Design a protein with these regions (language model features):
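Intrinsically disordered, low-complexity proline/glycine-rich segments
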Residues: 2-295
Length: 295
């Protein structure tokens, strides 16, 4: 091969390599996710993540009294009763931490009990909040005559829309539960999803379906005695930061799922017997206000 031919061959190889790199970059372009993380998290057409519920004293080690005080000073979303209990891993690195308002759930009276999750990034900046909406949940539970039907609101830091995740009342005993929600896309159109618990599962496995009933993701759960781990995957054409956030918070919710159902069942009974007068938190009440009201 002549020197000129060798140079041409070298340029061709470089062009092919650049094209391949560009193609890989396009395939791993996930809205709201850095290219570096996406490149490592995308495999076989799916975006992968892990939600790991801590079963060691890592919580106290990393978020003891001193660091709690420092974190509260850094973010007003990190309240004094915030208990960090899970981490989110994407592309092999920790990208998020999930906590809940411990006092609101563990210590509050029945009518004041609220389940509030918060998702932070690695540096403890707020990314999202998931709230159990007592008003909507009680309304649905009353309508279903005692079948616990929970509604959760998900508010993310970069979205103008709130996502409402609801448990379906269309459930027979011993059959899988379903949850539904929708996300507004970049063109202002809703994209609907359903999360269905697998009929045969040992650790809280769920499958994600799109509005056409196609399987587009899965949550593979491994529940331990005092913790758990969920390995999630979503088809890359559906994956964006908002959907990933909903699924990550939903995974963390699973260790509270049974308690949440029992709470709504108990509240429904107490309200029906006149033992409790329902009350809504001011922040939740704001979500029900008429957006066209005179201010």
């Amino acid at each position: 091969m002549t020197a000129a031919a060798a140079r041409v061959s070298s340029r061709v190889d470089a062009a092919v390599s650049d094209a391949a790199n560009d193609a890989r970059g396009e395939l791993t372009k996930i809205p709201g996710v850095s290219k570096a993380v996406a490149a490592k998290a995308v495999r076989n057409g799916y975006y992968h993540f892990i939600v790991d519920i801590w079963i060691t004293d890592l919580n106290f080690t990393e978020f003891g009294v001193y660091k709690r005080t420092r974190n509260r000073a850094k973010s007003r979303q990190f309240t004094s009763d915030m208990d960090i209990f899970a981490e989110v891993i994407e592309g092999g690195e920790r990208t998020g931490l999930i906590g809940y308002r411990e006092d609101l759930w563990e210590k509050a009276e029945s009518k004041d009990k609220r389940l509030v999750f918060k998702l932070f990034n690695e540096s403890l900046n707020w990314r999202a909040t998931m709230d159990l909406m007592i008003g909507r949940s009680l309304q649905q539970t009353i309508a279903s005559r005692g079948m616990p039907v929970m509604t959760y609101s998900v508010n993310t830091d970069e979205d103008n829309f709130i996502v409402y995740l609801e448990r379906s009342a269309n459930k027979w005993p011993l059959l899988p539960e379903n949850f539904g929600f929708f996300i507004m896309d970049g063109e202002g159109k809703p994209q609907f999803y359903r999360i269905k618990r697998d009929l045969i599962n040992l650790g809280g496995d769920y499958t994600l379906y799109d509005q056409q009933g196609k399987n587009v993701g899965h949550l593979d759960g491994k529940v331990f005695s005092i913790g758990g781990k969920w390995k999630g995957k979503v088809r890359v054409e559906h994956a964006d930061r908002r959907l990933l956030t909903v699924l990550q918070l939903f995974s963390a919710l699973q260790i509270f799922n049974a308690d949440s159902r029992r709470h709504m069942k108990r509240l429904w009974k107490d309200v029906g017997r006149g033992k409790v007068k329902p009350a809504l938190d001011a922040q939740e009440a704001d979500l029900y206000k008429n957006p066209r009201r005179v201010r």
